Amino acid sequence: MKPAAREARLPPRSPGLRWALPLLLLLLRLGQILCAGGTPSPIPDPSVATVATGENGITQISSTAESFHKQNGTGTPQVETNTSEDGESSGANDSLRTPEQGSNGTDGASQKTPSSTGPSPVFDIKAVSISPTNVILTWKSNDTAASEYKYVVKHKMENEKTITVVHQPWCNITGLRPATSYVFSITPGIGNETWGDPRVIKVITEPIPVSDLRVALTGVRKAALSWSNGNGTASCRVLLESIGSHEELTQDSRLQVNISGLKPGVQYNINPYLLQSNKTKGDPLGTEGGLDASNTERSRAGSPTAPVHDESLVGPVDPSSGQQSRDTEVLLVGLEPGTRYNATVYSQAANGTEGQPQAIEFRTNAIQVFDVTAVNISATSLTLIWKVSDNESSSNYTYKIHVAGETDSSNLNVSEPRAVIPGLRSSTFYNITVCPVLGDIEGTPGFLQVHTPPVPVSDFRVTVVSTTEIGLAWSSHDAESFQMHITQEGAGNSRVEITTNQSIIIGGLFPGTKYCFEIVPKGPNGTEGASRTVCNRTVPSAVFDIHVVYVTTTEMWLDWKSPDGASEYVYHLVIESKHGSNHTSTYDKAITLQGLIPGTLYNITISPEVDHVWGDPNSTAQYTRPSNVSNIDVSTNTTAATLSWQNFDDASPTYSYCLLIEKAGNSSNATQVVTDIGITDATVTELIPGSSYTVEIFAQVGDGIKSLEPGRKSFCTDPASMASFDCEVVPKEPALVLKWTCPPGANAGFELEVSSGAWNNATHLESCSSENGTEYRTEVTYLNFSTSYNISITTVSCGKMAAPTRNTCTTGITDPPPPDGSPNITSVSHNSVKVKFSGFEASHGPIKAYAVILTTGEAGHPSADVLKYTYEDFKKGASDTYVTYLIRTEEKGRSQSLSEVLKYEIDVGNESTTLGYYNGKLEPLGSYRACVAGFTNITFHPQNKGLIDGAESYVSFSRYSDAVSLPQDPGVICGAVFGCIFGALVIVTVGGFIFWRKKRKDAKNNEVSFSQIKPKKSKLIRVENFEAYFKKQQADSNCGFAEEYEDLKLVGISQPKYAAELAENRGKNRYNNVLPYDISRVKLSVQTHSTDDYINANYMPGYHSKKDFIATQGPLPNTLKDFWRMVWEKNVYAIIMLTKCVEQGRTKCEEYWPSKQAQDYGDITVAMTSEIVLPEWTIRDFTVKNIQTSESHPLRQFHFTSWPDHGVPDTTDLLINFRYLVRDYMKQSPPESPILVHCSAGVGRTGTFIAIDRLIYQIENENTVDVYGIVYDLRMHRPLMVQTEDQYVFLNQCVLDIVRSQKDSKVDLIYQNTTAMTIYENLAPVTTFGKTNGYIA
């Protein structure tokens, strides 16, 4: 039970009820007294009331006193008596009467004297008071001694209880259970042993009164009663009465009715006025009309009636408690509105015994209008709906409606609970009253206050649209503000914007998205007018990040991005090219364009669109790929390949081509060449000879858009010929050792061909590597001695053969074959003999000399040891064998028959001397034998008086001749004189011959050692002392430097210049007084004329080598070929040019290099590959190629353009930095390569540059300075080097600035020289030579 139920209070009683109840109770008590039969009793006799229930379930209220007695609102308990001692009743409805009891149940008045056997039994046993837990019994006894009796009262239930009563005829029995049937026995006794017969009475205790009686619900025509039942309560009866005076209650509304048979735990729906309508007119209230509730009960499990507005349930049973409730609920329906009622509830036992009553008052609700609601409110009308508290009779009501506005009011009557109120004003406050009327009675009215909303806006429109904003505007005259609901299509929620203006910009939108804008005008008190809606899409976002995923010659795959969820976008593409335009569309963010033209630029514009709303366009440009090249043709030489190809696209004139040249086996170092636009051929240089290459040619257009696949071609460069090879003889072997440096590049071997006359032999040699300058060596055997062979070696690679390298080599020599015979010796005089012999066979080499050997000893086989003995040794007796004569000869190879024709006769003893051997007179009468030694190689021992070194010479001996004996001397004096004269003549002749040969040999000397022209003077100064030295020499206007320079003027001028002065060479000199010394001039190879070796150039000593530099004049038109021939033959990699071609209107140097196209200078092709023009100098790169051998190498020209025409550079740092630039480049060149330096004459500026280079090295390596000595050395190799005093001072200034920069760590070296003088002047022609050459001043 809910707490609210416990707090329920009975409704207050009306004044009429308060005075009526005591009168009613008095009447009921009088009736009880009358029904008792008039018999007095010492204890009040309680009445017994019986409530009977008929079979039809309707409770009947008995009108007879015998069946129903009223006593204080309670019924008399039912009592039964019996003589049985065990107290059992003979029947539930039987009364056991004693003999003295009358027929009407009254007790008799007779008395009886107790017999001797014991007391008489009691009689007239009554239960004068019955409550739920106790019973008061009374009884009678006619014995005279009854006052002395004691009585034993017993009852048997679970436990028997005995009560002894002494000297009184009544007993109060307590501790009983409610609504329980008890049998009490009463036994009288005297003393402790004499007992009378017992008498019994059956009594049922009252049930417990109901509790927690409450009104659980009240309505207009209904009320719900609820109470709790105690244990033993079988059912309940309700007495329901309307309360009020006759004036307050009409005949129809007056009610008094009993409702019986209400069982615990059951819900009932009962209409008490049904009985009221069927009762007999004029019957007293409360005695007629009753209702048995058994037919109205319904299960508690059923759904309760739904309450209406003014109903309230109190304490419903909790069905989840798990216990069956004993509460009873009665719903009374059909009551009168606004009426007071009193309900009295009696608990009943199973036999109808009722407990004490419980009463409660309540009032039904009056008729009322409630929940007045305005619906369909517009600016000019609204619809009212409401409810009434009396739903059952609502159709009988009419309603008065009063509408009061701010300035007007109106009334309206309707017959149903709804009404339409027209003619209202917008944005106006109204008070509305609805009053129910039933007949003449008005119920409680309902009230409503309402504001009419403003008029809907007009001209609601979109003013501006962007990707994230939409502007809106409208018109309104009565709204205070406006509420805008923004709903995105496809989204469930919406956002709200509030504004007091009549326009708004809605931001934060998504591009390309449809939005609906519902505007609601807001009036007073938050009223809202009818909405207006407009829908519009934002502008789609422009696409971005357009990406060409893949492109071919005819297709292009594009994708792009959009910054929003653009699933509904349509993308329109415009594809434009020089061939026209095309349009297409797609729903995807990618598309493949087909049918395109190769190598064509397409401009693609993409515009997003959704629902005919177009976004901003975005575009990209892309070339389709060119088609692949075809028909590749390759022509090669050793280091270059010229390629040509074809492409048949219409756009091919706009193509360039990218060539990737990859050497086989070296894919990581591919060479790339890109042609100019429209060029379909290219020459690739700096390739490796004899190597296999693969070229891939991509056509490309625009910004490097290449063809999908390259055209491929494999080729091999021509193998490089070897520069030369050397032949070495094998001592005393008929073989040749061939040596050469492996040619550059790769090779598969060499073809060696050796021939001599008709004999020919070819051999394949293994390959070699050109890395690290590897020398190749092979030996050719089984040749003939001293034979000339034509040898050809051809490099082979990739199935190609290089140009053969040829040489003529002669095999070596060995000891000549000894002759078969012996010399013929005959006596000429007493001291001389004649020896005749034939020449040795020269098949082992040309015979270079013969030696005549005499011996006085035995004839044996001579050995090489005898060659060391002379006539003097013979005379001293050191040896009996000696060499007496030596013949030098040059016999070529010949056959044996020819050698026999060649005869030699030697006079021995003529006292001649040949190469240290004295042909002295023989002893008269002496016996001599002779043999001849033939030499193919004769070697003299320098430490043994220049005599023949037999061990080192190639010699063989003839056999000794027969001995010859000399006669006696006929004239010693004549012979001696003759011998002396003859010996002197021989010596003079031989000496003159030797002198003549030596002079001839010196005239043909090709090169003079530089050791002969070492500087003879030097002024070596330490670096730390140079600044003081400079200041000293600089004093008095450079007086000290002037004296030094004066001392240098005559250095070297006396050296011969024969080659330069030859008539054939005079025209090759730019200036007639600047001629190269013969001792150091550069000689070129002789081609068709002996003077072809001349060029006006000299080797110049540098710091590291005597040939570090070549100083030359600026080329003339007729010496351009010679100039480039010198560059090639002397392996020049760098040219230093220190003049402009034209200075002050005079030609100083011919422009000897090509500017655009490659140009041939005789056998040399020169092509410029790059040119960098800077303010102080220009750097040009060339490729120099020998047309005959196809060999080439790079060449860089450093053209210094900041040397004034008459003077020196403005600052020393320019020339010093220029020098370092040159030296950095030379680190990449071969170390033996000289630097070619020239100006106009090749002496002044050229000498200054060379001197600076040497001075910097000297300072860095020796910490000393020798300006004077270096200039002296240069002038010993070429005249006029460092030509002017200004240049000499400038050299010293450069040294000073270098020394200072090292000391101060300065970078910029600044030196100003304001003096100048004439350097090179062409004077009037000299008629002596008939040439235009002048002299240099």
Swiss-Prot record:
One GO term (biological process): heart development
CDD domains recorded: FN3, R-PTPc-J
EC number: 3.1.3.48
Residue ranges constituting the Tyrosine-protein phosphatase domain according to the UniProt record: 1041-1298
Posttranslational modification: N- and O-glycosylated.
Signal peptide location: 1-35
Main location: membrane
Protein name: Receptor-type tyrosine-protein phosphatase eta
Ligand binding (substrate): 1205, 1239-1245, 1283
Cytoplasmic side: 997-1337
Expressed in which tissues: Expressed in the promyelocytic cell line HL-60, the granulocyte-macrophage colony-stimulating factor-dependent leukemic cell line F-36P, and the IL3 and erythropoietin-dependent leukemic cell line F-36E. Expressed predominantly in epithelial cells and lymphocytes. Enhanced expression at high cell density.
Record: glycosylation sites: 72, 82, 93, 104, 142, 172, 192, 231, 258, 278, 342, 351, 376, 391, 396, 413, 431, 501, 525, 536, 582, 603, 618, 628, 637, 666, 669, 761, 772, 784, 790, 824, 910, 937
Phenotype when changing residue 1239 to S: Catalytically inactive and substrate trapping with higher affinity for substrate
Pfam family, one: PTP_tm
Positions with biased composition (Polar residues): 67-82, 89-119
Organism superkingdom: Eukaryota
Molecular function via GO: beta-catenin binding; cadherin binding; delta-catenin binding; gamma-catenin binding; mitogen-activated protein kinase binding; phosphatase activity; platelet-derived growth factor receptor binding; protein kinase binding
Extracellular membrane side: 36-975
Any one of the GO CC terms: plasma membrane
Family assignment from sequence similarity: Belongs to the protein-tyrosine phosphatase family. Receptor class 3 subfamily.
Membrane topology (UniProt): Single-pass type I membrane protein
Domain Fibronectin type-III: 121-209, 207-291, 271-364, 368-456, 457-541, 542-623, 625-720, 721-817, 816-902
Keyword Membrane attached: yes
Keyword Kinase: no
Function: Tyrosine phosphatase which dephosphorylates or contributes to the dephosphorylation of CTNND1, FLT3, PDGFRB, MET, KDR, LYN, SRC, MAPK1, MAPK3, EGFR, TJP1, OCLN, PIK3R1 and PIK3R2. Plays a role in cell adhesion, migration, proliferation and differentiation. Has a role in megakaryocytes and platelet formation. Involved in vascular development. Regulator of macrophage adhesion and spreading. Positively affects cell-matrix adhesion. Positive regulator of platelet activation and thrombosis. Negative regulator of cell proliferation.
